């Protein structure tokens, strides 16, 4: 700014001028209706990465669960420009209004095409063996099917404007597991080469890349060999997205992993495979990312839902490259918020960015809505200037969107939000002081924003909704825990005073819980804020419509009391003892709580059950205690879940109690899920055959252990899958595995001395 108050903003091209405007807007502040600029404003900058992009649109979750209105065309365009002003230069789009708008600002476009994605119903003989059995995908080894896909490609790109980039995705969904296609990676890349010829016939300047999503090691190696065989000038880049990483077990799941790369883990699992890909690629091909930073759980870089299952070769993450699997969503908040809820993860995504991006030419991130606003905005700023520190990019975001005065409070709130939504061992949700701190920070920031900004600020209202809803959930969980504690104390006293029936009746009358005044206030605040943010910009937090849950398993507690009321005195005492001292196996006994990060010291075979798909509430009854709905399992292995005990009393007799439950499956998975039963062995002696696991709501199963099995002081308990489970051809078994199939399954085990 010179003495004549003239501001000069210049760019080397049309987009450069747009970025200059973005820099100007980030530098100014508004005070009392007046624009203020720094005293000295001299900025000369250029982007660090060639490709900087994302996707724009509203999610089905927002429309169906959060009940938001549709965006207008102008609002869609505003979101595009928000990210472009932050530094984006390319957006994923189809043809039509969005394409035309992008081109009007000199922005680049990315088109997409599924190499084996059908455009409608196809003959059954053409159907691919997709990894989880989805239909509508073509087997490219069927000549007529391949010709059909080539014609689809020609029809789509002929007589239409050119995209700057075209992405061919490899899987999720798509691909084919059949023997004729193996290795599918080679079948796929040869088909993509033919499709690239078609595109270049009409649009010779379009750059082509593919993604290896859900490919296995053989697929990737076949593509490496194909690219190394001779120059493939038609291909610009290898695309890397969810399911591409051969050194992580995050969704979407790969079936095999490059265990050899873990010998020296370097900076950790995120960077191992990009480095290997770059090593294998010929120099004319680039590595381009398609990072998934839109889901807060069960996704490429998100909180894990459960500990990952073993891959097709039985491999699990090595313990020295393991930290990403220790990030779990808060076990209560995850019951309320959809995968596509409003959130921010500054620390985690900053780490991911810095682990991955040194190996690529840029990123066109995956976004499934507008709930990931901070993540996407931060990513674009880092693609422009990757040496920016985390505090710098967070502070810049808060100044840009909330104003200079409110920024410090909002920056603290962003860090707290990420911490609050993560499970913290030993600190359950009611003890998380950050919930109230976050709410207070965002509330205090509101009045510090310029009035004209605050009146129209949908984004602050989204952060405030999150605070009110999290506080409501915290209070609800605390209320339920207090009820459980009250009942446990009452039953404990009754057992000592021999008045159990009276205590049961009293306790059963306490289960109807109502919102406290503070809970009601939080819910009402979230409702009002949600209506305002929806009116202002078609955004609202889905959690408001999903607040009522049995968070801690009160359903089990109520059922146990009802059973005790109907039982005979001795059985009643046993049932009530579990109410007051649930895990206690008695003197000389052992308890194992199987599942993700639970103490199960006697397990020697099996691993935590991850459900094979995003967990939804319908899969298990919320009436289960947390320990009852978390399990170990095996897949198609011949050895089922196994526990081994040593140093037992050879003169004692033992019995064993299991908690069993089996999940519900979504319609697209259910037809191949025939597993219901399992058998139980003590050493090599069958003690229970074809035990049917209860559906959704767990129950207990108790058996005597033959004295012979414990006479040497050792005992092996082994589960065995039913004879008709995981049988059949290779493809059907793989689809079953990939969809969450289980052979044996168990939640808890008590080994107890008989009295």
Question: Where is each model-derived feature located?
Answer:
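Generic recognition of long tandem-repeat/solenoid scaffolds
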Residues: 7-11, 37, 136, 455-461, ...
């Amino acid at each position: 700014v010179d003495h004549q108050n003239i501001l000069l903003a210049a760019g080397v091209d049309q987009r450069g001028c747009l970025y200059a405007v973005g820099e100007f807007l980030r530098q100014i502040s508004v005070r009392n209706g007046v624009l203020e600029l720094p005293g000295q404003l001299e900025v000369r900058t250029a982007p660090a990465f060639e490709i900087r992009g994302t996707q724009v649109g509203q999610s089905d979750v927002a429309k169906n669960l959060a009940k938001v209105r549709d965006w207008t065309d102008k609002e869609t365009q505003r979101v595009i420009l928000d990210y472009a002003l932050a530094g984006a230069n390319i957006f994923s789009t189809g043809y039509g209004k969005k394409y035309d708008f992008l081109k009007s600002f000199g922005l680049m476009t990315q088109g997409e095409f599924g190499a084996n994605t059908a455009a409608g119903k196809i003959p059954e003989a053409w159907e691919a063996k997709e990894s989880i059995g989805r239909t509508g995908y073509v087997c490219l080894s069927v000549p007529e099917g391949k010709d059909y896909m080539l014609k689809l490609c020609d029809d789509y790109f002929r007589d239409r404007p050119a995209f700057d980039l075209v992405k061919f995705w490899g899987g999720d969904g798509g691909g084919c597991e059949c023997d004729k296609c193996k290795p599918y990676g080679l079948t796929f890349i040869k088909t993509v080469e033919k499709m690239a010829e078609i595109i270049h016939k009409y649009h010779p300047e379009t750059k082509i890349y593919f993604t290896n999503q859900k490919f296995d090691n053989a697929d990737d190696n076949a593509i490496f060999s194909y690219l190394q065989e001779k120059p493939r000038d038609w291909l610009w880049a290898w695309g890397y997205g969810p399911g591409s990483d051969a050194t992580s077990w995050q969704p979407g799941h790969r079936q095999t992993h490059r265990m050899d790369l873990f010998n020296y883990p370097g900076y950790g699992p995120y960077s191992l495979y990009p480095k290997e890909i770059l090593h294998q690629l010929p120099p004319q091909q680039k590595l381009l990312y398609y990072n998934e930073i839109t889901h807060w759980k069960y996704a490429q870089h998100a909180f894990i839902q459960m500990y990952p299952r073993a891959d097709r070769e039985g491999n699990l993450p090595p313990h020295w490259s393991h930290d990403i699997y220790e990030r779990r969503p808060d076990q209560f908040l995850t019951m309320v918020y959809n995968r596509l809820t409003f959130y921010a993860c500054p620390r985690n995504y900053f780490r991911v960015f810095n682990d991955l991006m040194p190996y690529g030419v840029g990123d066109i991130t995956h976004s499934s809505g507008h709930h990931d606003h901070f993540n996407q905005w931060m990513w674009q700023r880092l693609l422009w200037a990757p040496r920016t520190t985390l505090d710098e990019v967070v502070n810049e975001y808060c100044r840009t969107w909330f104003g200079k005065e409110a920024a410090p409070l909002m920056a603290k709130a962003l860090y707290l939000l990420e911490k609050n939504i993560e499970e913290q061992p030993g600190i359950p949700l009611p003890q998380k002081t950050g919930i109230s701190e976050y709410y207070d920070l965002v509330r205090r920031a509101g009045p510090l924003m310029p009035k004209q900004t605050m009146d129209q600020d949908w984004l602050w209202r989204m952060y405030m909704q999150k605070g009110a809803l999290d506080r409501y959930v915290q209070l609800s969980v605390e209320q339920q825990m207090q009820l459980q504690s009250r009942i446990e104390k009452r039953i404990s006293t009754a057992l000592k005073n021999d008045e159990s029936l009276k205590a049961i009746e009293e306790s059963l009358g306490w289960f109807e819980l109502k919102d406290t005044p503070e809970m009601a206030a939080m819910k009402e605040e979230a409702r009002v804020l949600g209506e305002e943010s929806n009116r202002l910009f078609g955004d609202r937090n889905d959690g408001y419509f999903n607040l009522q849950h049995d968070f801690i398993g009160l359903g089990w507690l109520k059922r146990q009391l009802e059973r005790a009321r109907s039982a005979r005195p001795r059985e009643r005492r046993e049932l009530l003892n579990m109410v007051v001292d649930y895990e206690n196996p008695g003197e000389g006994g052992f308890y194992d709580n199987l599942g993700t990060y639970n103490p199960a010291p006697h397990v020697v075979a099996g691993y935590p059950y991850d459900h094979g798909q995003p967990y939804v509430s319908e899969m298990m009854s919320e009436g289960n205690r947390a320990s009852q709905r978390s399990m170990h399992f095996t897949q198609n292995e011949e050895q089922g879940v196994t526990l081994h005990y040593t140093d037992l009393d050879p003169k004692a007799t033992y019995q064993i109690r299991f908690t069993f439950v089996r999940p519900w499956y979504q319609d697209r998975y259910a037809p191949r899920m025939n597993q219901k039963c399992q058998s139980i062995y003590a050493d090599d002696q069958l003690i229970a055959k074809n035990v049917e696991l209860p559906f959704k709501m767990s129950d207990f199963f108790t058996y005597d252990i033959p004295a012979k099995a414990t006479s040497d002081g050792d005992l092996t308990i082994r589960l065995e899958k039913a004879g008709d489970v995981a049988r059949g051809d290779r493809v059907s078994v793989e689809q079953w595995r990939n969809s969450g199939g289980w052979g044996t399954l168990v939640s808890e085990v008590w080994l107890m001395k008989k009295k």
